[in-house]
C-alpha cells in the first residue's frame, strides 16, 4: 500500500508498505532447484523403464551376457526420495518526510527517509528411499524381479531457516532556485545503512556510511554543469583507510538553442553535447564472502584432523605418541588494503531530426579500474603461505552505444514507431599479478577478462592424412598428443610452443570470445490503428561463446565424472564414428580410454552463442463502448502477450543468453498471457 499525506501546506509524509508470502514444494533430489531436470540429463534410455506395476525398475550390469558395462543415471532417480517445502515471507517498508523551508530562503527544503526490509524462509524437508527391482529373464521367457532395498519411512531433516534484514536512512537538504536565466540547485545528503546476517561473520552486521554533495547550474537550459562528491566509509578497511572521496563532474551544451542554429533547426531540431567524468569506489570483493581482512591473521585448531594424526599439532612420545593441539595460521591479512577505484568517462551526443521524428543518441565510454583486490601470484612458493589480498589489479573497459528512434503518423489513424540500439563493449586486463608462465600466450594479462585457457583444436585424427596435413599447415611434424595410442576420430591439438609434444604449455588464452558478448542489439517496433496496439521487442548478441561442460561434451559422464551419466540425442547424432567419419562432426570419437585427450579444454568445446530472439510481442485492443462513460471507465484494454517466443541461434545446448547455459540448468520457457486492463 502507498499513502501520501499533506500534513501541512509545506509538509508531506509518504509511506509505502509491501509484503509477500509464498510457499513452494518440490521433490527432494539433493541437486537443487533444477534437480528433476538434471536427473533427465544424466539418465540413459537403458537405465530404467520407470514404474512397472507400481514398482521402480532399474536395469543392472549383473547379467550373464555382460553386454552392459554400466547403466547410467536414471531419470526417475528422485522417485520416492522425499520432499522439500519452503515458506518465504518478506516485508518492505519505507517512510519519507519532506519539509519546505521557504521561510528561511526560497527554494530550500529538507527531507528524511528511512526504509526497512526483512525476510524469513523456513524449510521443511524429509528424505526417504524406496525399494528398486531389477528384471531377470527366466528360462521359460518370463521376467522376474529381484528386489533391492526397502521402502523407508520419511526421515525429517533439520535445516536452519534463512534470515535477512536491513535498514537504510538518509537526511538531506535540497536547494533549487531560478535567478532570471540562471538555474541553480544543490544537495547535501547523509546516508547510513546496515545489513544483518551477512554471509561472512553472520553475527556481525555490515555497515556503510556516506555523505554526498551535489551542485548544478544551467543558463537558459543551454549551458549545463554539475559537480558531485561522495565521502563514503566502509567497515572493510583499517582506520585511516576506511573513508574514500569520490568526485564527479558533468558538462552539457545544447547547441540547437544558439541563434546561429535557427537556419537548420527544421532539419536538425535538437543537438546536445555532453561529457561526464567521475571517480567511484568499490568496497566489496569475493562476493562479500570475506571481511575484516585488515585485522590480525586468524588462527585455527583443526581438532578433527588431530584425531587422525594428520592435522596441525605436536607429537610427544614414540610410536603411539600423543598429539597435542596447536594452532595454525589460517590466512594472511593486509592492513594496507583500501577502496577499489574506477575512473569513468563518457562522451555523448544527442540529436533530433525532422521535427523530432528521428531521435538519435551516441555514447562513448571509458573506464579505468585500479587497486583491484587480488592475491599476488608472482610470490614464490617458498613463502609457505598464500599471499594476502592486496590492491594490485588494473583493468580497462571501453565501448560505445548508438540509439535510433523513429516516430511518425500516416493519416489520422495510423501511428508507428521503430527503435534500434546497438552496443559494443570491450575490456583488457592491464595487471593481474599472475604466476609466472612459460609462454606469453598463457597470461590473462593483456586479454579480455574471462578469456579461457584451452588447447587449439586442429582436426579429428586420420592415420592416413592427418600427419601430412599438420606438416603442410605448420611446417613441422605432428606433435605427441595427450595420449600415446591415438585412434582415428580422436582430437589433434596444435603445438603452440613447437616443442614436439602437447602439454599444459600449449594452453592459450588468445582464442575465441568470452561469456560476455562484445556486441548487443535491440529492436523495438510498434503501431496503433483504430484501437489496435501492436508492439514487439527483438534482442541480439554476437561475438560471444560458451565452453560447454563435461555433461554436454562427454557421453555417459555426469557432473561427478563417475562415467554413469547420460547419452543426449545430439551426442548420438553429431559424433564422429567409423561408419560416418565426418571431419566436421561436433563431437570426436566417443571413448573412455582416451577421454583425457578428447574432452580436454579446447577450442572444439567453445561454441558460438550468438542469438536473435523475439523477446516479447503484444497485441492489444482498446475498447470505446457507450457503457464505459456511465461506469466512469476511462480505458478498457484487452491484451494478448507472449514472452521468449522465438530464438535463432547455432547454440542448441541451452539458452544462449544465460551464462549458466554451458551446463544443465532449468530451460527457457515461453510465456503467454491474456490480460484485461481497466482505468477509472
Q: What does each of the following model-derived ranges do?
A:
Residues 1, 18, 26-28, 86-92, ...:
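Small-side-chain secondary-structure face that scaffolds active or pore-lining regions
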Residues 1-71, 84-89, 121-123, 162-165, ...:
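Flexible loop and strand-edge segments within Gram-negative outer membrane beta-barrel domains
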Residues 1-7, 16-18, 66-126, 156-178, ...:
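Outer-membrane beta-barrel transmembrane strands
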Residues 10, 28, 100-110, 123-125, ...:
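Short loop/turn motifs that connect adjacent beta-strands in outer-membrane beta-barrel proteins
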Residues 19-23, 92, 114-122, 190-198, ...:
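Transmembrane beta-strands of outer-membrane beta-barrel pores
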Residues 29, 289-307, 390, 407-513, ...:
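Conserved small-residue
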Residues 76-77, 541-638, 642:
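Extracytoplasmic gating/loop element in the C-terminal half of outer-membrane beta-barrel translocons
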Residues 262-341, 352, 357-395, 433, ...:
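Solvent-exposed loop/turn elements at secondary-structure boundaries
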Amino acid at each position: 500500500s502507498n499513502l501520501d499525506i499533506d500534513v501541512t501546506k509545506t509538509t508531506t509524509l509518504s509511506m509505502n508498505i509491501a509484503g509477500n508470502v509464498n510457499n513452494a514444494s518440490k521433490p527432494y533430489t539433493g541437486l537443487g532447484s533444477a534437480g528433476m531436470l538434471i536427473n533427465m540429463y544424466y539418465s540413459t534410455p537403458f537405465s530404467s523403464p520407470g514404474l512397472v506395476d507400481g514398482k521402480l525398475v532399474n536395469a543392472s550390469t549383473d547379467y550373464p551376457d555382460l553386454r552392459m558395462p554400466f547403466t547410467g543415471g536414471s531419470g526417475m532417480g528422485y522417485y520416492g526420495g522425499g520432499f522439500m517445502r519452503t515458506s518465504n515471507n518478506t516485508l518492505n517498508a519505507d517512510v519519507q518526510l519532506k519539509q519546505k523551508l521557504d521561510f528561511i530562503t526560497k527554494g530550500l527544503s529538507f527531507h528524511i527517509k528511512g526504509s526497512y526490509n526483512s525476510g524469513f524462509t523456513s524449510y521443511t524437508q524429509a528424505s526417504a528411499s524406496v525399494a528398486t527391482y531389477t528384471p531377470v529373464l527366466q528360462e521359460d521367457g518370463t521376467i522376474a524381479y529381484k528386489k533391492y532395498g526397502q521402502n523407508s519411512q520419511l526421515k525429517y531433516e533439520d535445516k536452519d531457516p534463512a534470515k535477512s534484514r536491513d535498514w537504510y536512512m538518509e537526511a538531506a537538504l535540497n536547494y533549487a532556485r531560478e535567478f532570471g536565466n540562471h538555474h541553480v540547485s544543490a544537495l547535501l545528503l547523509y546516508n547510513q545503512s546496515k545489513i544483518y546476517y551477512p554471509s561472512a561473520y553472520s553475527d556481525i552486521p555490515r555497515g556503510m556510511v556516506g555523505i554526498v554533495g551535489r551542485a548544478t547550474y544551467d543558463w537558459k537550459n543551454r549551458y549545463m554543469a554539475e559537480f558531485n562528491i561522495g565521502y563514503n566509509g566502509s567497515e572493510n578497511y583499517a582506520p585511516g583507510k576506511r573513508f574514500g572521496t569520490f568526485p564527479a563532474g558533468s558538462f552539457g551544451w545544447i547547441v540547437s538553442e544558439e541563434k546561429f542554429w535557427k537556419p537548420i533547426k527544421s532539419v536538425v531540431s535538437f543537438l546536445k553535447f555532453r561529457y561526464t567524468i567521475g571517480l567511484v569506489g568499490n568496497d566489496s570483493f569475493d562476493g562479500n564472502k570475506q571481511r575484516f581482512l585488515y585485522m590480525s591473521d586468524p588462527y585455527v585448531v583443526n581438532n578433527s584432523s588431530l584425531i587422525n594424526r594428520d592435522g596441525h599439532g605436536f607429537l610427544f612420545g614414540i610410536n603411539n605418541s600423543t598429539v597435542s593441539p596447536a594452532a595454525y595460521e589460517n590466512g594472511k591479512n593486509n592492513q594496507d588494503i583500501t577502496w577499489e577505484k574506477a575512473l569513468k568517462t563518457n562522451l555523448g551526443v544527442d540529436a533530433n531530426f525532422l521535427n523530432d521524428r528521428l531521435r538519435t543518441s551516441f555514447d562513448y565510454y571509458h573506464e579505468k579500474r585500479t587497486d583491484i583486490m587480488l592475491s599476488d601470484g608472482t610470490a614464490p612458493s617458498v613463502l609457505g603461505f598464500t599471499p594476502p589480498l592486496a590492491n594490485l589489479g588494473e583493468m580497462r573497459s571501453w565501448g560505445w552505444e548508438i540509439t535510433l528512434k523513429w516516430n511518425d503518423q500516416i493519416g489520422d489513424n495510423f501511428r508507428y514507431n521503430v527503435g534500434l540500439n546497438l552496443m559494443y563493449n570491450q575490456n583488457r586486463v592491464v595487471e593481474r599479478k599472475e604466476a609466472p608462465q612459460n609462454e606469453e600466450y598463457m597470461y590473462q594479462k593483456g586479454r579480455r577478462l574471462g578469456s579461457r585457457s584451452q588447447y587449439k583444436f586442429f582436426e579429428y585424427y586420420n592415420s592416413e592424412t592427418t600427419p601430412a596435413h599438420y606438416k603442410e599447415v605448420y611446417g613441422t611434424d605432428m606433435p605427441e598428443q595427450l595420449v600415446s595410442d591415438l585412434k582415428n576420430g580422436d582430437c589433434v591439438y596444435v603445438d603452440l610452443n613447437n616443442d614436439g609434444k602437447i602439454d599444459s604449455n600449449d594452453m592459450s588464452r588468445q582464442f575465441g570470445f568470452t561469456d560476455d558478448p562484445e556486441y548487443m542489439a535491440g529492436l523495438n517496433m510498434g503501431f496503433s490503428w483504430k484501437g489496435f496496439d501492436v508492439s514487439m521487442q527483438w534482442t541480439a548478441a554476437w561475438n560471444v561463446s560458451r565452453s560447454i561442460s563435461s555433461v554436454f561434451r562427454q557421453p555417459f559422464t555426469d557432473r561427478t565424472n563417475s562415467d554413469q551419466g547420460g547419452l543426449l540425442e545430439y551426442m548420438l547424432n553429431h559424433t564422429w564414428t567409423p561408419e560416418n567419419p565426418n571431419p566436421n562432426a561436433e563431437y570426436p570419437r566417443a571413448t573412455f580410454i582416451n577421454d583425457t585427450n578428447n574432452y580436454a579444454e579446447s577450442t572444439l568445446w567453445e561454441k558460438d552463442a550468438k542469438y536473435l530472439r523475439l523477446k516479447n510481442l503484444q497485441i492489444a485492443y482498446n475498447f470505446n463502448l457507450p457503457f464505459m462513460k456511465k461506469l466512469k471507465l476511462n480505458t478498457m484494454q484487452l491484451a494478448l502477450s507472449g514472452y521468449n517466443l522465438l530464438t535463432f541461434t547455432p547454440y542448441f545446448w541451452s539458452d544462449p543468453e544465460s551464462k549458466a547455459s554451458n551446463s544443465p540448468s532449468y530451460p527457457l520457457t515461453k510465456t503467454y498471457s491474456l490480460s484485461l486492463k481497466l482505468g477509472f
